[in-house]
């Protein structure tokens, strides 16, 4: 799990270069701009477009906590 806020600030979406937000529930880094969720496995963010899943409902799923 990414616990250091500084690390999250350094990471950007590999497709858009935009900011990412952390979804602790799903263990994913979210790019609203690209509408993709990048998985975090064993504490390591997998920043490959081929590993990302498309967000459903334009990211509205993120607001259901």
UniProtKB/Swiss-Prot annotation:
Q: Which GO terms describe its cellular component?
A: cytosol
Q: Which InterPro entries match?
A: Trm112-like
Cysteine pairings via disulfide bonds: none
The record's listing under Gene3D superfamilies reads: 2.20.25.10
Signal peptide extent: none
| Pfam families referenced in this protein's UniProt entry, alphabetically | Trm112p (PF03966)
Q: Which family does it belong to?
A: Belongs to the UPF0434 family.
According to UniProt, the name of this protein is: UPF0434 protein BH12860
Protein species of origin: Bartonella henselae (strain ATCC 49882 / DSM 28221 / CCUG 30454 / Houston 1) (Rochalimaea henselae)
Tell me the lineage of the source organism. Answer: Bacteria, Pseudomonadati, Pseudomonadota, Alphaproteobacteria, Hyphomicrobiales
């Amino acid at each position: 799990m990414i616990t250091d806020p500084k690390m999250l600030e350094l990471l950007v979406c590999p497709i858009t270069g935009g900011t990412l937000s952390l979804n602790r529930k799903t263990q994913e880094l979210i790019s609203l701009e690209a509408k993709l969720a990048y998985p975090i496995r064993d504490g390591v963010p997998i920043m490959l477009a081929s590993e990302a899943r498309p967000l459903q409902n334009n990211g509205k799923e993120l607001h259901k906590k």
